[in-house]
Amino acid sequence: DYIKGTGTKLPKHTPISCNELLKAMLVHSDNYAAHALSRSAGMSRTQFIQKMNQKAKQLGMNSTRFHDSSGLSSANISSAMDLVKLAKYSMNKPQIQMLSNTKATYVRAGRQNVFMQNTNRLVREEMFDAAINKTGYIRESGYNLVFVNKHQCNKATIGVISLNNASSGARSNFTRHKLEQYGCDVLAHEDYGLEEDEES
């Protein structure tokens, strides 16, 4: 299917396993992979989105409403506190945790191995050790990032939710500044500046 406002590295009309789609989703923020994964669930689009909203309610995400499975609709809404609840839930899911923190990987698509890098520069360049993280972007909300540090900072678990940034570099720098401010150790000390992440 064509999804307006995004592209994909994945080849068309190619069999891809659900595990490989999840990998593309969580490492590279591939919206086509998210859409294809929902299509493979054995239910209609409407039923799948209903399941997403039911899960959000189950997690206490009372300000969250999903309108599509790819994450690109401006009708999808949430709140910072709901993202905290989702991050806590995701931290108890080893596969989600592992994939979201993978620097780069190959996604098996038919006979091809498609190289994909993490869309989060803090993970890709190993600035911090993440427990869970996820980037996001649409025009209406700007560049966003949820990042929870793996190791305690001054005896506390520190997470940063960076919303409505003008660029991917800005969200990375804001998050890095907050993690440093609360005593989280930087794993690399080069001056990374404002260079851009891959979009999403």
Report the location of each language-model feature.
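Penicillin-recognizing serine hydrolase domain
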Residues: 43-200
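Conserved catalytic neighborhood of penicillin-recognizing serine enzymes
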Residues: 2-38, 114-132
